[in-house]
Amino acid sequence: MTLLHCWLLLVGHLASTAYADFITKDFKSLPPPAYDTNATQALVPYNAALEERNGPSSSTALLQYIDHKPGLMKKLLAGLSIRFAPPTMKVISTPTDMLRIDKIKNNIIKSSQWKRWARSLLEQNSMQNSHVIITKKMMDDLKPTNFFLVLLEASKDKNTKAVAKILEETQFARWCTIEHESISPMEFYDVLQLNLNEPIAYMERLPVLLRYWKYYKSVHSPMSSVATPKDIIDKQTVNRFGPYWKHTGEIAELLRLDFDSDSFFNHPARNVWLDLMKTYLDDTKTAEPLMIKTFQLLGNAAAKNLQNNVYSPIHFAERWIQANLQPIDVVTILGLDIHDSNLATNSAFSFLKVFIEKFLVNHPEADTTVVKIFSRLGSDESEKALALRKSFVSFFLRTPKFTPKTVMSIFDLTISADYVEKNPVWAIWMEYVNVYLVKNKVCPEGPLADTLEFLGSTAAADGVVRKKSIELLYSSWSGKTSQDTRIKQFLTAAARLNQLEL
């Protein structure tokens, strides 16, 4: 055996002996397992049967996250009523520094530092509820605003989302059950530092505010009934506001919406409010005063073609059509009065106009409410009413399914001297007839031919409205000629009746 072989054998022997001594010494130095003899939270009991029935408690979930035990180890310990105490750690005297509040944009709860801090804190407060003591200490050290910003970051990570939810709900419960610490949702708005001039941050923090509002309401005004969601808008609304989605006045105040100026359109939560309105109106078919104000604001914006607002009437009208609402329902929702002489100038009328057009496409027939609306417009000679009449005429002409016979049916029109003089809707019919004839240069058989024949007859010679109708048609053909027999006959009769020269 060479000298080298002897040397290697000696080194191996010494190494194995030292390792055995180390292992023996290390095991002897370990503390004995801590048995749950006093049922304290320092030694957390684990009842597998109870957890199987009820699911993991929030305390269990929080402790499992802090201890970060592998899944296999949890299975092995599932039938035991003991847990091994975590290794003793040096008490951290400056937990605020440990939480690094100067870097709250990071997910602090995911860090190993936070876990060590939480373990140390629980060791010092073994007789208290784990999530309560952690929540309280974080609130004290971070202060409320930073505390919730930390939880907001943690909620974005699937690994810490559940822990963030536990801590958030724990603080909500403390505020709602400890009288001297109670704060209202309006005060919590300020805690979250919601700023209308910072829309991204506002919308990111708004769900936290709404969760507290729901929690606060559940404690002080418990309710269980919720709407049955019909679409994604309903689902989002119910998710945001819970069973309290009908508390629209309170919600508007909580969001700090301004309905008296165009600043409404710059509010980050404007669409949240509009979605709430859609769900609310589908259910109640009656608008609250703040909703009527909203329609007026949106109507003004649509009239001005302001960016992102011109489509609001379309969105609401389509939803009302899908909900099978009738014209009278929409009139009520918009807070309109079809007998009001200022109906055309009401800014919310733009919503009604869009709805009527979509409604008539699906129901091209007379509707009592629609006929009354056209009659009101026909009797109004204001600039706004004339513009609306012109717009409706254009709509009828560009929509193929609206033949002259269909339009006449929608107006519930009768061609007679008595009807013409007493029904203002005749004015809109004549505007339609005039544009149709000038555009097409022919007069087809049916309502248009009957109208020209009536106007050219002596039976209607003395009517005031009849004279205005003749003048309207005749002036449109000034300097023009037509090869259509009916049109030529009318123009000849019109000149004779009114002593006009062709």
From Swiss-Prot:
It is found in: Secreted; Host cell membrane. Keywords: Glycoprotein, Host cell membrane, Host membrane, Membrane, Secreted, Signal. A motif (dEER) lies at residues 50-53. The keyword Lipid metabolism does not apply. The keyword Lipoprotein does not apply. One of its GO terms (cellular component) is extracellular region. Glycans are attached at residue 38. Residues 1-20 form the signal peptide. Belongs to the RxLR effector family. Secreted effector that triggers a robust hypersensitive response (HR) in Lactuca serriola LS102. The response to BLN06 was visible as chlorosis but not as strong necrosis. Has the canonical EER motif, but lacks the canonical translocation motif RxLR, which characterizes most oomycete effectors identified so far. This is RxLR effector protein BLN06. The gene is BLN06.
